[in-house]
Every structure is written in structure tokens, then in C-alpha cells.
Amino acid sequence: MAKNVERLQAREAKELIRREKQLGARSNKFYLIYLFMILALIYITDEIASTISIQFQTNIVTEFFVKNMGMEYGAGLSLFSAIGFISYPITLLIVFYRPLADKFGRKPFLVINTLCMGLGLFIVYLSKDIYTYMIGSTLMGFMVSHDMQCVYILECSNEKTRARNYAIVKAVAILGTLLVPLLRTTLMQNVSERWHVVYLVPAIIGFVMALFALLFAKETNAFLTKRIEYLKTPIKEREQRSKEEREQNAQGGILTAVKFAFKHRQLRFLIIACCCFYLASLGTATYSTVMAKSALMTEEEITLALFLYPVGNALFTLISGFVSDKFGRKITIIAMSCSALACYLLFVFSGMFKWTPYLTGIAIGGFMGSYWGAGDTIGGIMFSESSPTNLRSSVTVINTLLNGIMGGLATIITMILLPIIPEKMFGYMYLGLTVPGLVGAIIIMWLFVGETRGLDLKTVTGTEWDKPKKNKEKTQDGK
């Protein structure tokens, strides 16, 4: 035991010297400029990896299920949705993977994540069957959920410029997805069977950016400062702190959080609102099928729509941020949910009635920006601001679970319906899930959920929105 402690101390002493040297190294005055350029390109790769398979859903199902297996499109899409559930257990590994960056640093995982996103894109480019495709797609899905480029942006910016820098890079990344329709026009030439080639260019960008990050990005000062402080802390003191943290965390836990949430008005209605809201989540993943099979848009028309998709997405993402800062969380969720509802209705009707692909594209982009603007606010902010400190982490997990459960439920419903309804009706089916979900969320947020902006998170108890209990006891004398 003593030898193990000595080895640990010796290893940490070497690491401490290395970390202090890294922290003391001076950066040139242009470092942040080229770092943010690298991060923006990595973010573009991340955004493309997040959305490209959604945008090529029709092509993927047609090749792997309709042509290779001889299935009808609806049955093929249903099976494709079922196969997607296989990746769920792998995604759960993020719980163990993500904390590694707190021990080994941000830079190694910025490089690894970017490299693996590029590798996933490249595997899909090479895929000839659904099995190879799923390997590449699952690898992409796992890595995009880590968002190490976001951590870099936040930790390399000061408090005054943090929000601005993040907003700028995020907007650039969304607009960078214009690369996909550009590649559809040039390399793919709007030929459905050539969809694989579109994956090649962002894969190459991912590989190059991983190399650039390895050569030119430095470890963040925020991590180095925290790690050095940890290494300088005696082992016994660390053990005592860990014990105290475990005792504090023992007050939490998902079951305790669920029981607490259902006992208190604010969290109870936030959960109900989320159940409705996430029922509409399939609208974010099925617009390719709606355009190709329900609206019967050609590859050229879909490409034109996708040129306007990032514009609508970026515009409504910025609007969401402005509304949140100006008017608060509740108004943001209601306003952006209304916007998402209007945009999705416009998307479906614009496509089905052949108005113009440009309007169809900006409408679905507006839906995506509005929907996730509301979703990030309700899940990422309001759950946290409505929970006491000792349960906050556990309560936010409820939102993640609701997203998976309701999204999975909606997927199962469509898996049953897709093989038996005409392709022309797919758009109306997704509309039938999206509209009631958003309307329900809007009504519940408007009537039953309180505002949380401006609350001191250190003093929130979660009971602030509970109605005072009425004393119904009566004396024998009457009133």
C-alpha cells in the first residue's frame, strides 16, 4: 500500500512540473485568433456530423433497405428507426467518457473527438451496407455529444466576452453547414445514388482539424489552474474532500430527485411540459423524408431548400438567445415553441402545396432553431434554476431521461404506422405528433410554470412556486 502511494506521489510530482510549465508558457498575441478559427472549423464538422444523416435519410433508406433488401420505403424507414435503438446503450458510455477530460485535460479529447468524428464520416463514405453505416453513424453520434470545442470556447474567453464568442462561433458553425448543399450540387450533382461522396469532404476537414488541434492548440488555463491546485493538495486532504462530497451526493440520486419533483408544483409541471415538448422531437429528424416522399420534391429542390436551412436555423437561434436575455425563461419557451409550431406548419404546407423550396428550407431551419432554443431553455436552464443545490444534478438527469423516453415513444408510434400508411401521408403523421406536443407544452408553460430568471441558485429550495396549504380545520363553534 505504501509503495502504491509513493508511486502515485512520484507520478503526480512529474505531472505537476509538466502542468506548471504548460501554464507558464507564453502565447503569442495571435494565438486566440487562430485557436478560434480552428474551433470554428471543428464546430462546423460537429454540426455537419450531427445533421448530415438526417438530411440524407431518404437516400440511406432507399439504398440500404429499398434497393438492397427489396422493402417498401415505409417498412424500411420503420426498420431503420428500430436499428437506431441499438446505439442507445453505447451512447450511455458518455457518462464514463466525459469526466476523463477533467483528469487528462481538454486538448487530448479535442483531438480525439475531432479525429473520431472525421473517422465516422469516412466510414459512412465507404459503407456499402447498413452494418458498416451504423458503425460510422454510431461513432459520430457518440463524439458529437461531447462538445469539447464548446468547453474550449468557454474556458478560453473571459467573463465579458464568453457569451459573445460562443454565439459567434456557434453562428459560424451553423452557417458552415451550407457546405452540405454545396457538395450536393457539385460532387453529388443531385444524383441520389452519389450521396456517399458528400461525407468525404467533412471527413477530410475533421482529419485536418484534428491535426491542427494537436499541433497548435494549447491546454486551457482554466484546466491547468484547477489541475495544479488538485496536484498540490495532499492526498489525505483530497480523501477528506471526496468523503464530504460523497456525503453531499448521498442526499441526491435520481429516485430522490423524481420523488422531490412530483411533490412540488414547478418541477412537476416542467416534467409534464417536457413530456409534451419531446413528443414533437421527431420533427427535427424526419424532414428529409417529408420533403422527398410526402412533398415529392426532387433532389434539386431538396438541395435548394437545404441552402436556406442553415440561414433559418442561425436566425432563430440568435432570436432565441435575445429573447431569453431580454424577457426571461418562461417567455422564451412559450415564444420559441409558438415559433417552432408556426415554422413546422409552414414547412409541411410549403412542401406539400409546392410553394417554393426556398420557403420550405428556411421554414424547417426556423423550426430547428426555435425548437432547440426552447428545448435548451427548458431542459438546460429551467430545471436547474427550479431545483435545490443538493438535488440539481440529479434533477437535470430527469430532463435527459424524458427526452429519450418521449422520443423513443414517438419513434415506436411511427414504426407501427410507417409500413401501413401511404408515403404521401408521412408529413401529416409527423405533423400529428408535432402540433399536439408543442401546443400542450405551450399551454402548460403558460398556465402552470413560474419564471426563474434572476433567482439566486444558492438559495433556491424548489418550493417557491408551491401554493400555500389552506387550513380547512374548523372549530366546534363553527367559523
Predicted regions and their residues:
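C-terminal ends and interior cores of transmembrane alpha-helices
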Residues: 115-128, 338-354
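Extracytoplasmic gate region of multi-pass secondary transporters
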Residues: 53-55, 264-317, 407-411
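Hydrophobic core of transmembrane alpha-helices in multi-pass small-molecule transporters
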Residues: 131-144, 357-374
